[in-house]
Design a protein with these regions (language model features):
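Short, amphipathic alpha-helical "lid/cap" segments that border enzyme active or binding sites
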Residues: 77, 150-153, 251
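C-terminal cap/loop subdomain of S1 sulfatases and analogous C-terminal strand-loop tails that border
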Residues: 106-112, 151-153, 158-229, 246, ...
Length: 267
């Protein structure tokens, strides 16, 4: 970015953290160590398909992990601030227009429900930040309707004036970003496949639409969850017995054109 470029520039910067191992700069760890609360899900056992990933968990261990994770998040913010500053300086120096796009691939339980890392379909793992700023982007707006990582490619292509990619499952978020339009009825999905310890392969799928979120596992249908994340952010209450029709509709949408049994058989 310190050099002039005649062609449009796409600069991709990847960072490892925040991620395990949970090692943060000492001053940031100390900053959050005394401020960190234990999650209300600490003593709630994860579902059976997650049990193989459980580790020894104590309140002090979880507090330390979460303090380190929050410290890593702040350190990430500081690093991103430097990248954003360099990008803005480059645009200003050369009179160019540009967009800054930040996203992540997954979250982290950090002791929530007794385990660490990703590989679940709870909000701790699947909900991530997606932040876009720059020319033409509505500043200070927060979208309430679900979006997906699959939206990144079509959005960037439209921003760049490039040809639309074929066979896209995502959508361009330009109307949302430029005019604050909401897609209140939109459904987004995530999928999960794992070889739990001694339990065989399992395949799970999550769908979020409107106020509801459904989590289903092919090998453990008895553990299906219907959750209302807006009113139940820690996902403590399974509402499937109260709203079976909502669960049926979401399940049909989540597994439409998905050969789940074949995925499990072929691993």
């Amino acid at each position: 970015l310190s050099q002039p470029h005649k062609k449009p520039q796409c600069v991709v910067v990847g960072t490892y953290a925040p991620h395990f191992p949970y090692i943060a700069p000492t001053e940031l760890y100390d900053k959050y160590r005394m401020r960190t609360d234990l999650p209300p899900t600490l003593d709630i056992m994860a579902s059976a398909q997650d049990a193989g990933r459980l580790r020894d968990t104590t309140p002090e261990l979880v507090k330390g992990v979460r303090a380190a994770y929050w410290g890593l998040i702040e350190f990430e913010d500081l690093c991103l601030g430097q990248v954003k500053s360099a990008w803005d300086t480059y645009l200003s120096r050369h009179g160019k227009r540009g967009i800054f796009f930040y996203l992540s691939d997954h979250g982290d339980h950090a002791g929530d429900r007794g385990f660490y890392g990703k590989q679940s379909l709870y909000e701790a793992a699947v909900r991530i930040p997606m932040i876009v700023s720059g020319d033409g982007i509505l500043a200070g707006n927060r979208l309430r309707s679900p979006v997906s990582l699959l939206d990144a490619a079509p959005t960037v292509c439209q921003l760049a004036g490039a040809r639309e990619l074929p066979f896209q499952d995502g959508v361009s978020l330009i109307p949302d970003l430029e005019r604050g339009e909401e897609r209140e009825d939109r459904a987004v999905t995530a999928e999960w496949i794992n070889l739990p310890y001694g339990r065989g392969t399992d395949y799970g799928r999550m769908i979020r639409q409107g106020k509801w979120k459904l989590i289903s596992y092919v090998s453990h249908p008895e553990e299906e969850l219907l959750i209302c994340p807006d009113s139940d952010p820690w996902e403590l209450y399974n509402r499937i017995a109260e709203f079976p029709e909502a669960a049926d509709e979401l399940r049909e949408a989540a597994f439409h054109n998905v050969c789940a049994g074949r995925i499990v058989e072929e691993k």
